Structures are given as structure tokens and as C-alpha cells.
Amino acid sequence: HRPRALFLNSVLQNPLGTSLSPACAHRILQFAEQYGLWLVDDDIYRELAPANAPALAAMDGLHRVIYVGSFSKTISPSIRVGYVACAPALAAELARTKMIAGLTTSEINERLVHLVLTEGGHRKHIERLTDRLARARSRLCAQLTACGLSLLAKPDGGMFVCAALPEGTPSSREIAEHALTQGIMLAPGEFFVTQSEPCHWFRFNAAYSDDARLYRFLETTLRAAHAS
């Protein structure tokens, strides 16, 4: 069957934390128009991205873009409140489908989000959050490099950093399984790819990477791999 839709993260893509360039975003819109594709932009990290990051929905005028936003990354992960922006006719169909498939979102949670957004402090909260994440990412990148890992990409913002293991080390899945025995949870590259071949990189969350045990484990594991 011919593809009908493309799902993507236009900014702070998971797992790399990178964003589309304006030129790449424009090419994707041209591609969607050429082949009649819907573009579902899962843009849940937008508030954590630089202000100049391209916005597919704005560039497209919601012609082929279905924009998905969320507050779970900036207010609370337990809120589970988001929103969709799209063409009016499609919005009516999506609302009907949502009512049939899952009824409504919690009204209490929606009212809480409305209060947070209208009380006047949300923008300052985002500024503090992005500043804390920037400092945490900087520390994480420096510590991973010191342990002997190499960054796959320089994140544009957000919380994720991906780093590769040196050559000659076990797969990231093997290391992650060993880490679990030490009480450390890692996200191996195998979680984020479709092929079955072993990966040798991890996705790290800067918001949860301040524990010194993580870096001691990485240093010890890599030393053991090089010695064998």
C-alpha cells in the first residue's frame, strides 16, 4: 500500500535531540505535497527548543501538517494533556474519532493546565527549565567524553544526549543488561532502531544523569573491555 502519512519530530528529535534545518523542513513539505502525504509533527518538545527552530505547521499553514503538542514535558509527565492543530475538516473528524475511541481527557487535568498557562508564570518556568537542562546537558556531555564515549550529535536543546562506545566494546544491549545488575538503567541504541544488528551507543537523559555511579560504571566497564 502507498504510504499516507509520515510521523516525525521536527525539533529535538528523540533520541538525538537534533532539529530540522529550515532547508530540510522546506524539502519535507515539498515531498509531502508531491506524494500527497500527511505530515504528523509530534512536536512535544517545542517549548524546550530554541526560538528560531523551524515550525512545519507555520511554514505549511496546516495544509498537510497535523501538529501535535503536549504539556507533559514542561508542566508534569502525569498530566497527559496535549492538543492537535490541523485543517478544520480534519479536526472535526479527529474529534469524532477520539470520542468514539477513548472519550475525553481528564477535565481536572485540562483545567490545571489552563490555570498554569493563564496565571502568568509559565514563560518564566520554561526559561528556568531550559537553563537547567542546558547546564545538565553540558555536564553530561563533558562526563561522557571523559569516560571515553563520543557524542553522536550535538543536541539543540531538550534532555537527550546520544553517545557511542569505543570500538571493541560489547553491544550497548549487553552493557545495559550488566548495568541493571548494578542498579543502573540505561537506554541502549537497540531501543531506537528497527534493524536487528547490535548497536554500540546509548541515549542518556540529562535530567537523570547526575549520579556518580553511572560514570564509575562506564569507566569500569570500558576499562574491562579494553583489557580483555
Regions found by a protein language model. Name each.
Residues 89-93, 111-128, 143-145:
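Amphipathic alpha-helix from the class-I
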Residues 181-182, 193-228:
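PLP-dependent enzyme catalytic core of the Aspartate aminotransferase-like
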Residues 58-93, 105-108:
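Active-site PLP attachment segment
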Residues 164-202:
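Conserved C-terminal alpha-helix-loop-beta "cap" of PLP-dependent enzymes
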Residues 130-141, 151-164:
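Conserved glycine-rich beta-strand-loop-beta hairpin in the small C-terminal domain of fold type I
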Residues 1-49:
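Active-site phosphate-binding strand-loop segment of PLP-dependent enzymes
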Residues 34-35, 63, 182:
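Helix C-cap/helix->beta junction micro-motif
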